[in-house]
Amino acid sequence: MGKAIFITGTGTEIGKTVATSFLAFAFQKMGLNTKIFKPIQTGLAEDGVSFADQYWYEKVVGLAQSEGLYYMEPAVSPHLAATLTNTTIDPALIVEKIEQWKRQYDIVLVEGAGGLAVPLIEKEQGFYMTNDLIREYNIPIIIVSLAGLGAIHHTVTTVSYAQQQGIRILGLIFNQFNAESIIHVNNIETIKKMLDLPVIATLPSLAKVTKHTMMALAERWLENNEQKQLLQEVLSVAI
């Protein structure tokens, strides 16, 4: 039986899909059969036909082993997209698919839509949120954040919210990291001091994102034994 990790973020457009792609290439390089599953996808790609995240995984970085479950054209929050398209989102079906992939793959990377407080379903008595799905089915998470100005607040508040919800956090990934920026470097150092969580990776901005550049990034990262060991430790405590 494989393991599942939920990839969430401090907000939208912070690079969860990039981080998920990086992890997929890294785990594959480590010899692990890896599946990407983004159960809820909203909004179309620039071609106006494909769904944006699926297009990224399949066409941009060449990760054919990616899959979704609910595809809705409106580029809005899942609960609103479901209302606009008359779609019924079933959390149990999402988990059923995760368990199915765990039986076939070593690692299942589940990419969420937005952050932890994103509503998935609107009910008469309130909202069913992303954090409800994660908590109810006990899926550990990795939190993705941008590395620049605002990273400290966004990361600390997201971690605090996750901990209040009883969600297990495996570590953090920071996107668009510039090692020459005093702000970026200090943000990471400060967050490490404030939070007792491992920083799994600091990913730079890539001039061009392709399968080759993403694979090269993962390979370079794994050349560092400490970084490779950290990924192995993350896997050891995932379920």
From Swiss-Prot:
Pfam families associated with the record: AAA_26
Keyword Acyltransferase applies: no
MF-aspect GO terms: ATP binding; dethiobiotin synthase activity; magnesium ion binding
InterPro entries for this protein: DTB_synth_BioD (IPR004472), P-loop_NTPase (IPR027417)
EC number annotated for this UniProt entry: 6.3.3.3
Keyword Cytoplasm found: yes
Name of the molecule in the record: ATP-dependent dethiobiotin synthetase BioD
Protein's organism: Geobacillus sp. (strain WCH70)
Lineage summary: Bacteria, Bacillati, Bacillota, Bacilli, Bacillales
Recorded name of the encoding gene: bioD
